[in-house]
């Protein structure tokens, strides 16, 4: 006998009118074990350069019907790329706009993954005690040790990051100083911070989570309502080209901008980022 799982969003009792994804959507799009593989870097980087992770610090995303989606950064999209980069020899720091702790979509955490979970526990304090992004930006110069900026996905990236002058300044610094920018899924929404100032990403191509897919997820209860705006549409208005219209785990490199389409791309993006950064920085 097949047990039917509910497509109704699950109540998040920590906030009024807030909801987690439905049991059905979680059964389709999450797993207790990740697809991490290919972590093989026999000649890791030994220098001082590191990754700056710009993480989400807000959990609740309003939808069109007033209900709140309980979100944050997606664990797979955050941890798998970082696992590869760390194995390749690159340490990382975490910053949020407020300086308050990173919010994760814990309902997507691969709790039974024997590699990812110890890695997360080892670095949890970085996410719980991040730097304030404005303080990081104030210290940036041509000699700063950050080799890349990484913006993880999850719908939490839609909250605050697209309007942040500090996010814009960090991205402008990275591109001006020939650093890598890495992102996937909804993370590229952070690029919208460049809309109202110098936009060095004009003309770049990326992979990202398709707007069309976001418009479908409420049907299975992944979100409790529809988004009030769609980041792909806005990225196109600012001169960026989104090369995918589906979700296949695709990754893409445009100069030093490395992107992926979804959590299914997290492992491949980690490999791509590690390989590209080793080629650029390993002696």
Swiss-Prot record:
SUPFAM superfamilies: Class I glutamine amidotransferase-like. InterPro entries: Class_I_gatase-like, HchA, Prot/Nucl_acid_deglycase. Keywords: Cytoplasm, DNA damage, DNA repair, Hydrolase, Metal-binding, Stress response, Zinc. The keyword Protein transport does not apply. Induction: By heat shock. It catalyses: N(omega)-(1-hydroxy-2-oxopropyl)-L-arginyl-[protein] + H2O = lactate + L-arginyl-[protein] + H(+); N(6)-(1-hydroxy-2-oxopropyl)-L-lysyl-[protein] + H2O = lactate + L-lysyl-[protein] + H(+); S-(1-hydroxy-2-oxopropyl)-L-cysteinyl-[protein] + H2O = lactate + L-cysteinyl-[protein] + H(+); N(omega)-(1-hydroxy-2-oxoethyl)-L-arginyl-[protein] + H2O = L-arginyl-[protein] + glycolate + H(+). The active site is at residue 185. It is found in: Cytoplasm. One of its GO terms (cellular component) is cytoplasm. One of its GO terms (molecular function) is protein deglycase activity. GO terms for biological process: DNA repair; methylglyoxal catabolic process to D-lactate via S-lactoyl-glutathione; protein repair. Zn(2+) binds at residues 86, 91, 123. Its main location: cytoplasm. It comes from the Bacteria. Gene3D superfamilies: 3.40.50.880. Its EC number is 3.1.2.-, 3.5.1.-, 3.5.1.124. Homodimer. Protein and nucleotide deglycase that catalyzes the deglycation of the Maillard adducts formed between amino groups of proteins or nucleotides and reactive carbonyl groups of glyoxals. Thus, functions as a protein deglycase that repairs methylglyoxal- and glyoxal-glycated proteins, and releases repaired proteins and lactate or glycolate, respectively. Deglycates cysteine, arginine and lysine residues in proteins, and thus reactivates these proteins by reversing glycation by glyoxals. Belongs to the peptidase C56 family. HchA subfamily. This is Protein/nucleic acid deglycase HchA. The lineage of its organism: Bacteria, Pseudomonadati, Pseudomonadota, Gammaproteobacteria, Enterobacterales. The gene is hchA.
